[in-house]
Curated annotation (Swiss-Prot):
ATP binds at residues 11, 72-73, 102-105. Belongs to the phosphofructokinase type A (PFKA) family. ATP-dependent PFK group I subfamily. Prokaryotic clade 'B1' sub-subfamily. It comes from Sulfurovum sp. (strain NBC37-1). Its cofactor is Mg(2+). GO terms for biological process: canonical glycolysis; fructose 1,6-bisphosphate metabolic process; fructose 6-phosphate metabolic process. This is ATP-dependent 6-phosphofructokinase. Homotetramer. The gene is pfkA.
Amino acid sequence: MKNIAILCSGGDVSGMNAALKRFVEYAFDQGLTPFFVENGYEGLIDNKISKADYSDVAGIISIGGTKIRTSRSERFKEISYRQIALENLRGHGIDGLIVLGGDGSFKGMQKLSDECNDIGFIGIPSTIDNDIAGTQYCLGVDTALNAIRVAIDSIRDTASSFGRAFVIEVMGRECGYLALVSALTSGAEMCLIPEVPYNLEVYKEEFLEEKEQGRTYFIAVVSEALKNTEQIVRWFEEEIDIESRMTVLGHIQRGGIPTVHDRLMAFHFVTSAIDALREGTKSKVVCYDDGMFICKDIKDVAFKKYMIDEDLLALGREFESPQHKQV
C-alpha cells in the first residue's frame, strides 16, 4: 500500500473538510501518498485526481461542505464509465480509495470493487439523514441537528410573540431521525415522522384543551418524508383555529461550521478507514457501533433498511400522550 485517494459523493455534509484534513495528515504519518478526487465519481471518470499536500487542508477544518466538491453521477451507473474510472485510479497508482457518502455512493463503490481486485475500497457514512443501516452515526448529523435547533429556537420566539402555529419541515429523505431528535430537543408540541403512526384527532383534543388553558402558540416538526407539511398547516388553521405558518428549513441543514463532535467523528472515521486499507481490507464500510468503529460488509450497510433505535421511537410516541406537555 503506497497511494490512497479520497472522494466525496452525493449530498455534502459538514465534517467532510475535517475528514480531508485527517486523511492527508494521517496518510503522510503512515508513509502513504494521499490523493484527492475532485467532484465525486464524476471526477473519477474525468481523471480529476491529484496529489494532496498539507497546504491543501490548511484552515479548512472549520468550513462546512467539502473542498474537493461532490456530485451525483449518472454516468457512473454504466460499466463503461466505471472501467474508465478504474483505469484512472490505476494510472495514478492508487491502491485504496475512501468514499464519503450514503447508501447510493456505497452501492457504486460495491460495483467498482466487484469489477476489480487490485484496489481496496472503504466507505465512510456521510449523510445528515442518519439513515445508513449498520451504523449508529453518520458524519454531519450533529451539525445538522444544531442548525435545526437554532432555527426552531428562533421560530419559537416569533411564534410566542404573534400567537401562531409554526409547522417546520426538516430533511431526512425517507427517515424521520432528524425530525424526531429535533422535536424532542427543541420542546416541540407535535412531531410527525413516517416511523410512528399518528392520529390528528388525538392531537386536536389535546391542543384545544391546551388553548383553553391559555396556550397561544404551537411548534410542529414534520419529516419531509411525509410530504404533508402544507396539509398540517391547514389543519392547524381549520381544526385548532390558530393562524399558522410553514417553514421549510431546506439546505441550511447541510451547511455551516462543523460541530466539535462532527470534527472528532471525522478524525475517527478516517483513521479507521486508512488503517483498514493498510491491513488489506476491501469493500467495507466503517460503522460506528456502541462506541466502536467497525468495518462491515457493504451488503450489510447499503442494501439494508435503517431502523431508528426503539428507545428513541418510544419517546416519539409520547407526543400524542396527554402527559406530553411542553413549555
